[in-house]
Amino acid sequence: MKVEVYKGAQGKHNLKDYEETYNTFDWKDVEQAFSWSETGKMNMAYECIDRHVDQGLGDKIALNYKDEYRKESYTYKDMQRLSNKAANVLSEHAEVDKGDRVFIFMSRTPELYFALLGVLKIGAIVGPLFEAFMEKAVADRLENSEAKVLITNKALLPRVPVDKLPNLKKIVVVDEDVEDNYIDFISLMETASDEFDIEWLKSDDGLILHYTSGSTGQPKGVLHVQQAMLVHYISGKYVLDLQEDDVYWCTADPGWVTGTSYGIFAPWLNGATNCIAGGRFSPEQWYSMIEDFKVTIWYTAPTALRMLMSAGDDIVEKYDLSSLRSILSVGEPLNPEVIKWVKKVYGLTVLDTWWMTETGGHMIVNYPTMDVKLGSMGKPLPGIQAAIIDDAGNELPPNRMGNLAIKKGWPSMMYRIWKNPEKYKSYFIGDWYVSGDSAYKDEDGYFWFQGRVDDVIMTAGERVGPFEVESKLVEYEAVAEAGIIGKPDPVRGEIIKAFVALRKGYEPTDELKEEIRLFVKEGLSAHAAPREIEFKDKLPKTRSGKIMRRVLKAWELNLDAGDLSTME
């Protein structure tokens, strides 16, 4: 199959020569960017905010915020002052100490960011929660982490089962007219001191505890530590390409790892102006966000790009998006059709990035200056050794599908699974962290995602990666979304079954099923063509936009779908 290539960009970029940088890279050199390389005193919040104030950038805009009711900007000096106030409120009134788990369960407003930085200045471990979580998802995470303090909004309080959480000592409410049995964050912020003695930490002290769901069992707590900032910083520099005058917008919610690693840490470690949008998605709101703040670098998800794509090309003409110089994507692989649409409408090559909660930061990505092979994951971040291995830990040659693995020891690698050391050990084969994703590496060193290992289909002796088939399905004009699974078959072992959501204007017919099947057969191969197609009004997706194939499989085989707290 012929691969389409978009040429890398020319001009002023932080990463000029990928191969040279990769071959000479040393994490020790990255440490020089931080004050702790000289002082030995480490704290993520200091490096994100106070360091820039101390270096004379206090008047630079750190945060632009906009929702239906508010439009505000805060300088780095403002953020220093307000995060100090938040730290004082939390330490004095909520009795937060170093190492405590403090969870944040609230809507996206500036106060969330003040509070999160305040938690980190105390030396506590922050636990982000997505605001759409319901009671069980909240309870599972607070109970497992033994969270001491929760910061939330009044509207979300009914989802917090306080009587089932004996370790939860204090609840901080960020709202007007707070009841006396809660800590009134906004009122206390007004009178709190704007000076705070930051808790200095070691590289392996706790930073953030993200819970991630699997196909079985309860969500697991993935702990990252202070030294993760090395990966956040250098990926912000080389991948996001953050420079002095950039205005950056990451659309991910801070309840998810992208919303913290790349919605908070990476931009502020690099001294960028960071934009936050409150409220719900709409094409008009998003385009006006870019226009109003003159966003230059935009980090979003394929699902969002597909939603903008379905809104049409005409709406784009109503907004001035000329400030944009880079668009990146995360959360699921980019279908080539989306890449082509972005190129046509915005005139930019959207850059796919691969990583996961457990890795803490970018691992395999596409870079502004490097040629993009449409549909490829790209190449490893400098400092990251990636490979395709078999189940015994042996590296496989080019173009052989296997386990996508990373050589352990990078700074943002998960430090532990909270209270589950056996689960932590299960991620590794020898010195390799095994991602659970299936991929292959081509002869040029580009990696190609094929799906979760559990999702790879063996049909009549052939291995088929679901993503390749799904990408072909959504190229067909009638198909809006597609997910495929392997369905047990007595003759072939498995057959490919596709679940398809149609675009408006198309009716689900047997004739259309056959047209779609032939389209895949002619575009890929006979063994990759679905033998069964089922039409659905919508497909199960995570809130970050990934098709939940395990749910499709559970539907088909009448199985338990596992934890559904992340399903939209």
Give the ranges of each region predicted by the language model.
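AMP-binding/adenylate-forming catalytic core of the ANL superfamily
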Residues: 136-143, 148-154, 291, 298, ...
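Structural core segment of the AMP-binding/adenylate-forming
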Residues: 2-6, 10, 117, 121-187, ...
